[in-house]
């Protein structure tokens, strides 16, 4: 196994295109994570069509890099705007914003990046070591086990529906109905085409994903009342912190990373929950819980290490069982399918080289994330000031180009609009 892991890492570091796309993916992810309203899921959805023309290893490496960068990028707006860039950074605002108001924004940002680095490393390392072992176990699955896994995946709808299970089940029903449009895979019989030649091909998976996640987010952002962005000033020298700032927090760092990893493995939860739980655990374990909420490093370290560790955790059920751990891995599932692969028990057997290549690219993406965040913090902070009326049209145009490029059909662009409206209605 270790030989395969090393070969996968070597393949990534020896491929300039993979390195370039991982670098670009991390940068894109940080930008989407930092901008409130444009989540990592929207970023993945938007760039999923871009990977269509890439080699499988390069395209999937770019998507995982966006995942890593987007999860970490949320800390920037959480600290400087007191607005979490992603749901996974909610707990970061509890301590980050008070520290920024004290004039310690640079230290808060530096500690957040360091915690993100350690958390992601823990998650990726455990994923790399644990996934192949679980894959060997899942290869022994028979019909009963496959049925159980499929049934379990369907029951996850109840965990992902928020307060209304009925709405979630109806959404699943509509999803399955849309999936039946087109030609039957068994006898090529036309289903629900209503005489339309365009509907014969059905709705492309990418059109559905980009519409539901990216276009709907754009509509939501555009329809919301925009307030002038006030970014708190900050000074950040070097890494932004010293080893003395980590005194007494090494245990918190490791514990929170493990909390995020464990919660990430549980499908349907992910970083949006792990950061809150890790923050609560850190507060209850602290000798001075009354200081939490006043602006101390402990809360930032707990939140950012846990939400980034959940990345590796969420990837484990995706790769070994084909069950996405959160919304971002659901998009990655679409990425695998786009490139002709189905995550699950046979993935390691049929595409083992690619999987280990992804492991290597995620490790490289983790390093790029830390370097870019520390070195390019000033640039990312300036991006927070970009007006919404510039961002929204740009994103719509890029998404439309990606949808049209799939099959050179204007119909796919109309499908993008349709599912964007559906996604907006579902979010309301």
Regions found by a protein language model. Give the residues of each.
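Helix-loop-helix hairpins and the membrane-proximal interhelical loops
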Residues: 1-57, 132, 190-296, 381-382, ...
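Membrane-embedded alpha-helical modules
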Residues: 110-223, 338-428
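Short helix-coil transition sites and intra-membrane helix breaks within transmembrane domains
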Residues: 31-41, 79-90, 122-126, 263-272, ...
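Flexible loop linkers connecting adjacent transmembrane helices
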Residues: 46, 80-107, 133, 234, ...
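Transmembrane alpha-helix interface/packing and boundary motifs in multi-pass membrane proteins
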Residues: 26-40, 70-82, 157-162, 258-269, ...
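Membrane-interface alpha-helices at helix entry/exit sites of multi-pass transporters
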Residues: 57-61, 98-115, 286-300, 323, ...
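A structural-propensity feature for long, helix-poor, extended segments
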Residues: 67-78, 296-321, 325, 343-372
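Re-entrant/interfacial helical elements at transmembrane boundaries that shape
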Residues: 40-50, 63, 78-98, 129, ...
